[in-house]
């Protein structure tokens, strides 16, 4: 693009475009969240987006729900550890959240290590992932304490403030509008990923859109 200034100086400017801002709240333990996050990673390859990865916690969400089945409550105990570590990483090494989520999520979901039960169940995997992405393994110390719980709750509440407190993970904000989901059972690739994202952005821009839903009829695939 050519601009003629008032002093008759001619300059060439390339037309600039704004990146689409995406905020993605995740709990690494959730397999559906994992598939959605891998879709966003595919979108990064074909669209100009800027993603902020923010931890939330199914353990926080389900606090006080004593009516839940015992095995599910045991899973929520296990999920505290990784969520706390992500809160510490977000607060102190925010540029590493993406890499840690990719590494630990791959170990848990693609490595068929999910669904663990009881406090501390994920600590060995967390330690491996911290080392793999160049983070201090000492960050694992927060997994078994309440040291960062206030910070974790604040990150989690950031998602709830956008969509309400009766949804799980993921919560995805496209610009100023946030939704729970989308829930996918496969990871869209290439231009398919981009086209689905374009549709989501269009829905997000319509101020009176709230929900689309249907029952799931197939299981998850991560590859």
Each model region followed by its residue ranges:
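Short, Lys/Arg-enriched N-terminal segments with co-localized hydrophobic residues
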Residues: 3-17
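A broad structural signal for alpha-helix termini and local helix breaks/kinks
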Residues: 2, 47, 93, 133-134, ...
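Local sequence-structure signature of Cys/Sec-based thiol-disulfide redox active-site neighborhoods
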Residues: 18-39
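Solvent-exposed beta-strand sheet faces enriched in polar/charged residues
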Residues: 23-25, 54, 173
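Proline-centered helix-kink/hinge sites
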Residues: 31, 55, 169-170
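Structural alpha/beta surface segment adjacent to cysteine/selenocysteine redox centers
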Residues: 34-129, 199-203, 211-214, 220-223
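C-terminal cap of thioredoxin/glutaredoxin-like
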Residues: 39-41, 117-223
